[in-house]
């Protein structure tokens, strides 16, 4: 059942409040590791469709996912924000005429329903097709309760409470004004979240990305509890990442993924964002919980945002970054981008349009060695830095003399560097920090991107690295 009353008349913007943080949470459970024993692999609609994914595009991407990504271990197909938005459209098109929908589709309990604008057939056919193909399906949710539900004061399912009883009307997301936060101290608050996530469980959703949540520990706990109360295993992904703080790891570990960067796009500066956050969170991933460096903006992006409508430039900015385009990173920068995700054991969520994906992008995100490093599940650590050359290492689980190295050139010009075994931290005696075997053994090396193999001797080797490029190596001790 859909209720159609606009939320635009509710005041917004000026009353955004700081996170509501309780001091009452004293013990925190951890998520079940078997839900994400390795970094999740999948596709998310945001980079290519913003918050305007529609039914036909979803189905086309799902079929392309099955053909192009699933054979390589990719599993999660995720519909991002907007699937419940009743958008105003440019006449005769599916292009949006507003950044975020003014109206939302809700049921009588104030719970989200698929949009009649973009999902007139519902999302059940997409869910069923994903499961038929052996894939898992995810949706995006915002923290809190729809402001429309509060205005209508809808009942909280299974209780005598109503939406207005639990809303924290001073807590509004800065970039999407659909919801109020929840006052977690109020009776009915947990019950509301229970009902929202039980509905997703009944739809057979497998993955939930919850946005505007990371700065709100109490609501992280409530949503994690709601998922556990739903009776269905659903992977929980926390977003966005601009305020992620290692001190809050006990809360984040109620989830399976936590964004550690702000939005990442096809810009060289965003490579620096990823490096900087990786440094902070290095070594913190483990089975069931993975720091997330955001989606992979390869291929066609922002497809619902052409530069002009009917020859007239837009007078408002839509969601995401920029207009319709092909990824603007160079081929070398793309190698660096995906190598970071591989060595960091970050979840890999492809963002570009899959039906139109170019062969080069596909070759990077399906490379067996890259995925082997990522799925090894050891979050890489920084072992060397000098003159803007950084070396990151991820060792193979239970095999200290095997692993992967990324030699990154973070300079604005190409560099030639000569590195020895000590620089690369190769040949360290197991269970010691910096005690090298004597003599240091030779290592077999595979240059993953340049498709070369060689023996690395302790004395060293020179590497030529493009600006913002990488040498990505798999290594193992030579016999």
Language-model-derived ranges and their functions:
Residues 2-46, 52:
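Mature N-terminal, pre-catalytic/accessory segment of carbohydrate-active enzymes
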Residues 40-45, 75-80, 85, 136-141, ...:
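Structural recognition of the beta-strand scaffold that forms the well-ordered cores
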Residues 65-129, 133-201, 205-207, 216-217:
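Aromatic-lined carbohydrate-binding/catalytic grooves of carbohydrate-active enzymes
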Residues 166-171, 183-185, 235-353:
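Glycan-recognition surfaces
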Residues 335, 341-344, 349, 385-431:
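Carbohydrate-binding surface patches
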Residues 335-384:
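Catalytic cores of secreted or luminal carbohydrate-active enzymes
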Residues 423-451:
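Solvent-exposed beta-hairpin/edge-strand motifs
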Residues 456-479:
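C-terminal beta-strand-rich structural cap/linker in extracellular carbohydrate-active enzymes
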């Amino acid at each position: 059942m859909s209720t159609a009353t606009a939320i635009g008349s509710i005041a917004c913007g000026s009353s955004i409040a700081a996170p509501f943080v309780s001091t009452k949470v004293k013990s925190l459970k951890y998520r079940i590791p078997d839900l994400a024993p390795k970094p999740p692999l999948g596709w998310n609609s945001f980079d290519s469709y913003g918050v305007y994914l529609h039914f036909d595009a979803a189905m086309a991407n799902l079929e392309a996912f099955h053909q192009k990504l699933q054979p390589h271990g990719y599993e999660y197909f995720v519909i991002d924000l907007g699937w419940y938005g009743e958008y105003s459209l440019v006449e005769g098109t599916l292009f949006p005429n507003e950044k975020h929908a003014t109206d939302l589709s809700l049921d009588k309990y104030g719970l989200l329903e698929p949009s009649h604008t973009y999902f007139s057939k519902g999302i059940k056919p997409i869910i069923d097709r994903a499961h038929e193909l052996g894939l898992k399906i995810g949706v995006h949710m915002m923290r809190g309760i729809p402001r429309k539900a509060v205005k209508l004061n809808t009942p909280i399912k299974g209780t005598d409470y109503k939406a207005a009883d639990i809303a924290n009307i001073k807590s509004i997301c800065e970039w999407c004004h659909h919801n109020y936060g929840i006052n977690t101290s109020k009776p009915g608050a947990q019950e509301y979240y229970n009902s929202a996530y039980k509905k997703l469980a009944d739809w057979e959703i497998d993955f939930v990305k919850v946005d505007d949540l990371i700065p709100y520990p109490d609501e992280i706990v409530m949503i994690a509890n709601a998922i556990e109360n739903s009776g269905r295993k659903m992977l929980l992904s926390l977003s966005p990442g601009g305020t992620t703080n290692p001190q809050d790891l006990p809360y984040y570990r109620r989830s399976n993924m936590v964004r550690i960067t702000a939005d990442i796009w096809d810009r060289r500066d965003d490579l620096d964002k990823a490096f900087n956050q990786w440094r902070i969170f290095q070594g913190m991933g483990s089975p069931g919980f993975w720091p997330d460096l955001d989606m992979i903006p390869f291929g066609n992006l922002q497809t619902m945002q052409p530069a002009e409508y009917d020859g007239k430039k837009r007078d408002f900015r839509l969601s995401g970054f920029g207009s319709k385009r092909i990824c603007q990173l160079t081929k070398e920068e793309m190698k660096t981008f995906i190598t970071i995700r591989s060595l960091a054991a970050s979840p890999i969520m492809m963002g570009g349009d899959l039906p139109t994906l170019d062969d080069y992008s596909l070759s990077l995100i399906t490379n067996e060695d890259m995925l082997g490093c990522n799925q090894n599940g050891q979050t890489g650590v920084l072992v060397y830095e000098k003159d803007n050359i950084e070396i990151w290492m991820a060792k193979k689980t239970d095999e200290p003399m095997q692993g992967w190295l990324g030699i990154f050139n973070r300079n604005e010009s190409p560099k030639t560097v000569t590195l020895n075994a000590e620089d690369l931290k190769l040949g360290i005696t197991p269970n010691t920090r910096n005690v090298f075997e004597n003599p240091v053994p030779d290592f077999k090396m595979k240059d993953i991107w340049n498709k070369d193999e060689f023996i690395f001797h302790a004395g060293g080797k020179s590497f030529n690295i493009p600006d913002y490029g990488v040498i990505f190596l798999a290594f193992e001790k030579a016999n």
